Structure formats: C-alpha cells, structure tokens
Amino acid sequence: MEIKNITVLGSGIMGHGISQVSAMAGYNVVLRDIEQKFLDKAMEKIKWSLDKLVSKEKITDDERNKIISRIIPMVDLNEAVHNTDLVIEAVPEIMDLKKKVYAELDKVADNHVIFASNTSTLPITEIANTVSNPERFIGIHFFKIGRASCRERV
C-alpha cells in the first residue's frame, strides 16, 4: 500500500513537527486537534520554522508555500481521517487518553488505515489492544522534529 495521505492527531510539540516533516516529504497532511486555537498555534509554529529555513536558504519561498498548502488543520475527527492512509497519534503520554483516542478512531477510520502511536514511554501492545485490528498498529517515534528525518519503529 502506498501512503499518500497522513493524519496527525495532536498539534503540540510533536504533532506540529511531525506534520511539518511529513509535508516537507511531499505527503498530504491533516493536522487534527480538539480545538481550533491549538491548530492556529501549531500552524504559526510551522510557518515560523519554515520561514527560518527560507532565511537560511534551505528552502525557497515557493517550497515553503507548497509545504504549508499540504497541511490542513482540522477539528472534526471523522473529516480528518476521511481518505487517510496513515494516522500518527501524538497526544499527551496518558494511557487512558490514548486508549480513548484509538477507541474513537477505530470507529471512524477505514479498514486499510495504519494506526501509529508516537509514544516513547507507554506499551504499544496495550494501546494496540484498544483497536479491532491490532495488526495494523505500529509504534513510531520521531526525534529532533523539523531538523532530521530520523524515526524509530517499534
């Protein structure tokens, strides 16, 4: 399966960074959070980071604009996972919260969608057992968001 569309759940430090590097890699990204104000702040941070790359001549203005155009901020979960291939969850490291997110996600995502948790401290198998098809669940951990393309898969 080729991945073209990614949904990132959570727009905090990790979520907005994952969205940025995914868009920089050419993927279409939906950045989803529970309130618009969180999304607005995340998009400001992404734009600031990209502006810095432009000022250092790492990317052009045109590339910056194309990257930003590939990120769609969204509050509605159903809409956020529509047509997605991969969901990367980056919500706070609270097991009950992650389980709640995946229980909701399991109800609305298509059967082909891969679920990925960015957790660095919680057991992946415990989170994966929340969904109906745990075999489509992976752990993926990003490092140095926005500066490197390094990630760990569990």
Per-range role (PLM):
Residues 37-41, 52-115, 121-122:
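Rossmann-like NAD(P)-binding element
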Residues 18, 98-99, 125-127:
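Short glycine-/acidic-enriched loop or helix-start segments at secondary-structure transitions
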Residues 30, 72, 88, 138-140:
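Hydrophobic/aromatic beta-strand patches that form the interior of the parallel beta-sheet core
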